[in-house]
């Protein structure tokens, strides 16, 4: 009888441990989602100039007279198997104090040369934004690049995360030492955001991506750190296809 009681108690204890561990995982997943919620709930912002009237997370690191600066970055990276890695994207700095926006479009080609050491060759094309239109500030002779800039749209302009709460059973990571955190979800090709990316980019794989939400800083909010989203289609040693996006709010003196 004593053995039976010990066995029952052992099973109950094990069940409690599993339940508590699972509960902690679910709780942390909810915290990670919530930390991204304020930013992702803003998507889509079709007219980027609306950000002049939107305020991000402020803390005592901000000067009271500083309205802050939004930093937008969208990038598509494609490296077919054993070929060069090509990254194309754009960064904009939207100063809410002066209501002016400048940044650059970039093309970065990374090649494996000199005994496998990677060499990148990034070219930047300065731009500004006027009336929600991206305009090069210097002459560009390459017609292909001019067209890419003219047609460029940031993910924040067409992405939509109203169904974020429906993403379940994510792979959650949290390091309180840094602090850093992430949540990874397997998507399908029927996902709205995946369809939007395939509509705008020539993505050379039929594989459905994983969505990665990753950030650093206090989970409850901080002007220090970052929050990035990434759609990873392929991730191998010599083959990579992924799209990354970020919308950050920083002190104007930091950018």
Swiss-Prot record:
Key words, A-Z: Cell membrane, Lipoprotein, Membrane, Palmitate, Signal
Highest taxon in the source lineage: Bacteria
InterPro entries (alphabetical): Csa, Csa_sf
Annotated compartments: Cell membrane
GO CC term, one of those recorded: plasma membrane
Protein family per UniProt: Belongs to the staphylococcal tandem lipoprotein family.
Identification of the protein by name: Uncharacterized lipoprotein SAOUHSC_00052
């Amino acid at each position: 009888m004593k053995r039976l009681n010990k066995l029952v108690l052992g099973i109950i204890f094990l069940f409690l441990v599993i339940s508590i561990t699972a509960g902690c995982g679910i709780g942390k997943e909810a915290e990670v989602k919530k930390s991204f919620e304020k930013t992702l709930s803003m998507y889509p912002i079709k007219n980027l100039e609306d950000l002049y009237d939107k305020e991000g997370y402020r803390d005592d690191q901000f000067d009271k007279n500083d309205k802050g600066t939004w930093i937008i970055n969208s990038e598509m990276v494609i490296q077919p198997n054993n070929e060069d890695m090509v990254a194309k994207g754009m960064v904009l700095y939207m100063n809410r104090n002066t209501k002016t926006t400048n940044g650059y479009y970039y093309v970065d080609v990374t090649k494996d040369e000199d005994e496998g050491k990677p060499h990148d060759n990034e070219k930047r094309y300065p731009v500004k934004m006027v009336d929600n239109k991206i305009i090069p500030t210097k002459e560009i002779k390459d017609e292909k690049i001019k067209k890419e800039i003219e047609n460029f749209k940031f993910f924040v302009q067409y992405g939509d995360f109203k169904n974020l709460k429906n993403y379940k059973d994510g792979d959650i990571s949290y390091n309180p030492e840094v602090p850093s955190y992430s949540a990874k979800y397997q998507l399908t090709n029927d996902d709205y955001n995946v369809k939007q990316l395939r509509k705008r980019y020539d993505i050379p794989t039929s594989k459905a991506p994983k969505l990665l939400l990753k950030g650093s800083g206090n989970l409850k909010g901080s002007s220090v750190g970052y929050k990035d989203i990434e759609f990873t289609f392929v991730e191998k040693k010599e083959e990579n296809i992924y799209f990354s996006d970020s919308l950050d709010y920083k002190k104007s003196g930091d950018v």
